[in-house]
């Protein structure tokens, strides 16, 4: 740890070195589930560790909110309208031995109002272009972290 302008700065508890392996670029189909579609691509291609980015539009969406006090996803925003995907970013790792995609998204409606949060299953794709960067190195595994209640990387 060190101090930076009066603030305590912690060093990472663990850092792993990765190198790019493969890059997948494509689009999801009309009415595909946004999260399910990306997850399916990762599972089909055996992508165990990586980064995802998506832009496009959805016909609806469901965003999760993690209540830090309750250590649970307690609030979900259900958006039953057409939305632009301004940004979708996430990572790929293993959770309970399965390939797992964790993604957050920022969406905007026709007036420019934005919504953001944890992407939940159920967002129906209108158009979605994805970029998936597979990483070469130690597989990332998620395990429940007792201090947050979240399944976080263990390595």
What do the predicted segments below correspond to?
Residues 1-101, 106-155:
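N-terminal intrinsically disordered, cationic/polar leader segments
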């Amino acid at each position: 740890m060190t101090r930076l302008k009066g603030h305590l700065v912690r060093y990472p508890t663990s850092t792993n070195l990765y190198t790019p392996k493969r890059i997948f670029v494509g689009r999801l189909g009309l009415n595909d589930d946004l999260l399910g579609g990306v997850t399916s691509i990762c599972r089909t291609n055996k992508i165990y560790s990586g980064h995802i980015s998506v832009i496009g539009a959805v016909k609806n969406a469901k965003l999760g909110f993690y209540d830090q006090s309750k250590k649970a996803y307690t609030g979900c925003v259900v958006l039953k309208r057409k939305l632009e995907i301004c940004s979708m970013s996430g990572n790929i790792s293993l959770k309970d031995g399965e390939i797992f995609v964790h993604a957050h998204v920022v969406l905007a409606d026709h007036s420019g109002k934005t919504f953001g949060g944890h992407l939940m299953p159920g967002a129906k794709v209108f158009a979605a272009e994805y970029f998936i960067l597979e990483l070469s190195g130690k597989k990332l595994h998620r395990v429940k972290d007792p201090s947050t209640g979240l399944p976080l990387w263990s390595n």
